[in-house]
Regions:
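Positively charged n-region of N-terminal signal peptides that target proteins for export
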Residues: 1-5
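Active-site metal-binding motif and surrounding structural segment of the metallo-beta-lactamase
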Residues: 51, 62-106
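Divalent metal-coordination and catalytic microenvironments
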Residues: 33, 47, 57, 71, ...
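Bacterial N-terminal signal peptides
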Residues: 7-17
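Metallo-beta-lactamase
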Residues: 22-24, 28-30, 52-53, 60, 109-153, 160-161, ...
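Accessory terminal helices/loops
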Residues: 203-209, 217-292
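Conserved beta-strand hairpin/beta-sheet module of binuclear metal-dependent hydrolase folds
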Residues: 25-69, 155-169
Length: 292
């Protein structure tokens, strides 16, 4: 009951946030202790308590300095923890923005390989494998890893008090859709469906109703029912690739002959294009044939 009441309260706040914007950088104070910030179409979150602030994905050096300036000018505690949601450099390249050696930087274990050679990335001080609970100043944040999905080490972040998820990629708050990058260099077909199944299990167990993504959109939050809808999309891609192989409509370069495919099931999804569908099916057939 407590979680349900907080969810209603949170949704009311999400539609009336206090906003601050400058130089392409903007901040939405969703509540007293939850802040959403964005820069150039990417967004992330800042969790503030009486003792310190916890930053998820500082994005880049400019954004990190803007966040530090916001905290200072609003008499809010400085950052004690930084959480990397995954290893992609466009979300974590802070440069020299953080000089405080006491900041704990947390990442999933598989991220280490991708972070070791980039001097613009503040190196993690703590790695975890499957689950980590962070409790600071009475705030609890749970980190979950469900295997490779969007890259090798993307995690799910659960804000326990708000009962809200931060899902950095693979989902959109408006609903299931084609991905923004159809070349899918990051996609891991071998474990993607299991990732969604595990995420659905978490949502059901914790009775989580809403999520925020790592990309700006018309809606700040989305319903967690979208998780199952997006899983169905990827299952469709997988079964299409498998059936196309059986039907012999995939050529030697792993391109599908769309003229021999009923396109209606795919056209219902937002951001559909035939070129993107070809690329996605090619990604799956490449995996089926070569394991890559």
């Amino acid at each position: 009951m407590k979680n349900s009441l907080w969810t209603v309260f949170l949704f009311a706040l999400l539609f009336t946030p206090a906003s601050i914007a400058s130089d392409g950088f903007s901040i939405k104070e969703v509540s007293e202790d939850l802040i959403v910030f964005n820069q150039g179409g990417k967004q992330s979150i800042l969790i503030v308590n009486e003792e310190s602030s916890i930053l998820v994905d500082p994005l880049n050096e400019h954004t990190a300095k803007q966040i530090q300036g916001f905290l200072t000018s609003n008499s809010k505690p400085m950052i004690s923890h930084i959480i990397y949601s995954h290893s992609h450099w466009d979300r974590i390249s802070t440069g020299t923005a953080f000089l405080n050696k006491d900041v704990e930087v947390i990442a999933q274990q598989a991220c280490g390989l991708y972070l070791s050679s980039n001097q613009a990335v503040l190196k993690p001080t703590k790695y975890f494998q499957n689950y980590l609970e962070i409790t600071v100043g009475g705030k609890t944040i749970d980190l979950y890893y469900y295997g490779p999905s969007h890259g090798e080490c993307m995690i799910i972040i659960h804000l326990v008090k708000e009962n809200l998820l931060f899902i950095p990629d693979l989902l959109h708050t408006k609903g299931a859709r084609f991905p923004m990058d159809p070349t899918l260099p990051y996609l891991r077909p071998a474990t993607l469906i299991n990732f969604f199944i595990e995420l659905e299990t978490l949502v059901e167990k914790k009775e989580i109703k809403s999520f925020i993504t790592g990309h700006t959109g018309i809606k700040l939050t989305g319903s967690t029912s979208i998780i199952a809808e997006q899983r169905v999309f990827w299952e469709l891609m997988q079964t299409t690739a498998e059936q196309a192989e059986e039907d012999g409509i995939i050529n030697l370069d792993n391109f599908i002959d769309l003229e021999k495919l009923d396109l209606e099931p795919y056209q219902q999804y937002e951001n559909y294009s035939s070129e993107d569908l070809i690329n996605i099916i090619r990604r799956y057939t490449s995996f089926q044939n070569m394991g890559r």
